[in-house]
Structure formats: structure tokens, C-alpha cells
């Protein structure tokens, strides 16, 4: 069963990718969806068997590296952390596969798309189930490559190619530091197996542990899109919407957080790394929320929302509340996937337009999409008794419950980030569904026309009928679009994820963060006793600070709605003022981080590369190579040719020098010494060269005199 969890998505990917022409579009969709759905069922069984019964399972397939001083197996382990991570990864992957059947139905490359999706799922399973850092790195690189392939799936679009390359190169920075961290672990302990490394972690020097932790943190920063290495995340929205839901909800972006949780026995012994995680997550939360508030692309707003929630998870890791971070990761995966798929349903209905300023009034035409996006947004802003409420508010309470300067400061910063999260969630819902219609009129005529046709077919049962000539002409002139809600395959994942977004947090909160829970008794998550704050969080935090995020959420939601409905001119006038214009431009351009990177890092590296190419490749190497050799040989040939001056005395001198050299060489060989011979030879050679050069100068002067005389005679 456990091996099937790993292998089935790979088999589906191979069949769809290599035999897509044989099985056809429907066959590729059926095989990949069935393989992932069966894998999901097996993973749920593993969750109950391993998680509730505390029976970790290890599978060793074969030896991968076998040397005298280092052995590593191609092995997998299923502990409580692994099976908990598999739940969101596989459930959302299977729902995205189902959703893509309808969403990508008009695309001519269905087999390739489904092959990439299944391969991505397989690589994520490898990353999560690996029992050593090296095998985990295989999955880590695999999801990076699959992300590149999926973001650039529409490879004829320049923006998609640029975005995929940006994601790939940005993640290489984190991968470089992760590799350095693995080398330091290997140099320190001589092994990369989790069991060996974590059992020896208490005996590692604290400075070495800090270096390892910082390298792992930078690797997680790139993959989980923290401040500094976050620029790839909004650009990755150029891929198809199901890809955004899969990559940026449950899989690739959570890989960095998973790495930190898996390495908890290492980073628990470095307070520096924990403090860095705490502040990095806080800055990321407020930074991304503020940027998301000023974006106009519906998918980019949700992407920055993802970045903000990842910052909350990193805050929980900095507080050593790894179980809370895992709980929030799982909860976030469900409602964020629902937001992305709901956004995809909206985009699908308005002819692929993503600017929500051109939406408005879609509530009546997309009632299911509006309902599920409202549920997901309520869960995102931690509305009471929604899934996100049980984890997000607990992270804020944990920050205050640490009762330190950093903890209270991070609580304040994260609460401000939660306020901005509320504002952009209200903004997306209001401008998309509730505001006055702002889109092109033919979209709404399209909706109304197809609603009438739907009602006619429903009541008469006729599927074939003739339309009036003017209606037929109107339909033919409309752009390609899907009116109203999508079909069964588009709606089913939305309903399932909506149920998860409402009930999952309440059902599982005692399993993951309950004080009496023994779910993590197998030590897959390690919390040092001096860092334990669960009791203080539950019982010592004042009620006011527990309710403060909720109060701010409700207050600012009402303020945003009142300003939009009652005082829209106030917002417009502020935006058109000099201060508002500058503020909007600064935040809309993402704090000008990309400008800074391009100007001071990218251009500097490109200039440095150009100079190195110019000096080394085209300079030193060519000078020492064929170009330089040619110049030296030409110079030597000219020097030798200059010895021929056609003057008899020079030839006599050469003969004399050669004769003397011959005599002294013979004498020196007889006497066993060569010093006098060398000195005399050098002296004579210098005399010869000076004489020949003077003679050549005299010869040139004579030639010039002869030429000038001839010219005078000609005149």
C-alpha cells in the first residue's frame, strides 16, 4: 500500500506523457485522475494507520550510494508528519486533476498537461516521504523542474517563458544554500539520514547548528516565497489556473515550511535561527499583505495572500509551535486552493480576463462561485468557526504567549498583516461580485442569453431547437467564453473544498494542536522543553488579545464596505492626490524590489559576466592561445629576418661568434664548466644584436636617401 502511494502518480504520468497518442485525451485524463484518486484513498488509510496508531513505516528499496565512508539508501518513511502532509497534497492534487478536465478541455495539449500534473504530484510525494536529506533534495529539485514546465505550459507566450525562468532561477539561489547546508551536515556527522542526524543533533556545536539552520532557512525562503526571494511567486501566475492552485496552495510553496518542520530537531538547538524565522515571517506577512492590497489582478492578489499565510507559518516555526504551523499549512491548503479554483471559474466565465476592476455584478450569474469564494475568504480572514480560524488565531496568540519583546512585536505586526488581509479579501469579493457591472457589455448579454436558453431547455426538454436569426448572429459574434457556472467537473472540486474550508479545522484541531493529543508522539516534530509555550498560549494570554484580531477583522471589513458604497468619491479623490498617487504607485510596484534587484544585482552580475568574458575568454585565453601564438611567431620571424642585412661584415661577425661558441663549448665540456662560456656567449650576442640593429638603421637611412634622390631626379 505504501509503495503504491509513491508509484501510482509516476505510472499515470508516464502513460499520459509517453503513450498519450495511443490512449487519447480522455484516456490520459482518466488514467491520471484515477491514479491520483486511488493514491489519495491509500494516503487517507495511511493517515489513520500511522497517525492514530503511532506505527511509523519505513521502506528501503535499494542502495543508492555505497562507499567506504558513506552509505545511503533509496528509502521512504511514513511517520505522523509525512501522512499529515500527504493529506492536503493528494486531496488537492486529485481535485485539481478533476477540475482540469473541464478547465483545459479546449487546450490541444491535454496529455502533456496531465502528465506534468501527475509528475509534479509524484515529486512532491518523494519530497515528503524521503527518509534522508539527499532523497528529499531529489523531490525538491523535481518540484522545481515541474513548476518550470507547468508555468511555461503555454510556451508560445513570452510572459509565461519569462515567469518560468524567473521562478527557476530564484529557486536556484535557495537550492544553492540548501546544498551548502547538506554539505555541512555531511561534514559534521558523516551522514544525511534523518534518524542519524536528528539523534546526534544535541551534540553538534551551536555555531555549526546555526550555520546549518541558516542555510536551510534560506532554502526554505526561496521555495516558500519569503521576503527577499519572493519575486517569482506573483510571476508564476502566468500558468494555467489549476497549476496556480496546485503549486501555490498545497505543494511547492509549502515545501520550504515542511523542510523547516522536518528539521525541527536541528533548528531547536539554535535560538538565532528561531529568532530569524520569527522576524522573517512577521515581515513577510505585513509586506505581502500590503502589496496584495494594491494589486488589480485577481490571481496575483491571491498569490500575495499565499505569501502572507506562509509568513504566518514561519512565525509559528520561529515560536517552536511546529504542530500549529502544520495545522495552519493544511487548513490554508484547502481554502487557498478553493480561492484559486474559484478565481479560475470567474476567469473562465469572462473570457480569460483577470483584472477584477472589469468584473462587477457577477453574483447573480455565478452564484456557486460567489458562495465558495465567500466561504474561502471568511476562512482566510479567520472568521470564527471557519477552518482558518482555528490555526491562524492560534498563531497570533502563540506570538503573544511567548511573553518576550520579539513575541509581542511580532503579534502586533502580524495583526496589522491580518487587517490588510481582510481589506484585500473584501476588495476582491466586492469588485468581482457585488459592485456595479464594470465589464464589457457583451459579457453580461452573453450571461443573460445563455440563462434564457438554459431555462428553455430545462422546461421543454428540447436539446435541439432553432434560434431567431438575430440571436444566432449575436451568439456567433460573442467571444469564446463559458457563461454562468461551469459543468460538473468544474463545480465538484469547489463544493468539496468549500466543505473542507468550513469543517476541517473544527474536526481536526484536537488532533494537531490539542494539549492531550498524542498524534506526534513519534517525535517527527521535536519541541525543546524550554521552548514549549502551548500552556501559556491556552491559559495565560488575556482574552482581549485573543479577540483583538477578530475585532479588527470585522471593523475594517465594515469600514471598507461603507467607504466603497457610501463614500466612493473619497477613495477616488485620495487616489488622485499627489500623496495617494505616490503611495499607490509605490505599493503597486511591490516596494520597487524588482527594480532594486534588476539595477543593483542582475545588471551588476551581467556586467561582471561580460567583463569576465571579455578579459578571460576573449582576452587572456586568446592571447595565450592561437591569437597570441600567431603574434609571437610573426614577431620572431620578423626579428630573424631583420638579421639579414646584406652586409658582409655582419655575416663575418656571425661566423666569428659561431666559431667562438663552438670552441668554448668544446673547452667547457672538457673542463666540466659552462659559466664562462655562457657569459661570453651572452656578451657576444648582445654585441651582435646591437651591431645588426645599428647596421639595419644605417641601411634604412641609406635606402631613404636613395629614394629621396630618385624622387628629386624625377621632379
Swiss-Prot record:
It is a multi-pass membrane protein. It comes from the Eukaryota. GO terms for cellular component: mitochondrial inner membrane; respiratory chain complex I. InterPro entries: NADHpl_OxRdtase_5_subgr (IPR018393), ND/Mrp_TM (IPR001750), NU5C-like (IPR003945), Proton_antipo_N (IPR001516). It holds the Pfam family Proton_antipo_M. One of its GO terms (biological process) is electron transport coupled proton transport. Keywords: Electron transport, Membrane, Mitochondrion, Mitochondrion inner membrane, NAD, Respiratory chain, Translocase, Transmembrane, Transmembrane helix, Transport, Ubiquinone. Its EC number is 7.1.1.2. It is an enzyme of class 7 (translocase). It catalyses: a ubiquinone + NADH + 5 H(+)(in) = a ubiquinol + NAD(+) + 4 H(+)(out). GO terms for molecular function: NADH dehydrogenase (ubiquinone) activity. Its main location: mitochondrion. The chain crosses the membrane at residues 1-21, 30-50, 81-101, 119-139, 140-160, 177-197, 200-220, 241-261, 274-294, 310-330, 331-351, 366-386, 403-423, 487-507, 543-563, 647-667, 668-688. It is found in: Mitochondrion inner membrane. Belongs to the complex I subunit 5 family. Core subunit of the mitochondrial membrane respiratory chain NADH dehydrogenase (Complex I) that is believed to belong to the minimal assembly required for catalysis. Complex I functions in the transfer of electrons from NADH to the respiratory chain. The immediate electron acceptor for the enzyme is believed to be ubiquinone. This is NADH-ubiquinone oxidoreductase chain 5. It comes from Neurospora crassa (strain ATCC 24698 / 74-OR23-1A / CBS 708.71 / DSM 1257 / FGSC 987). The gene is ndh-5.
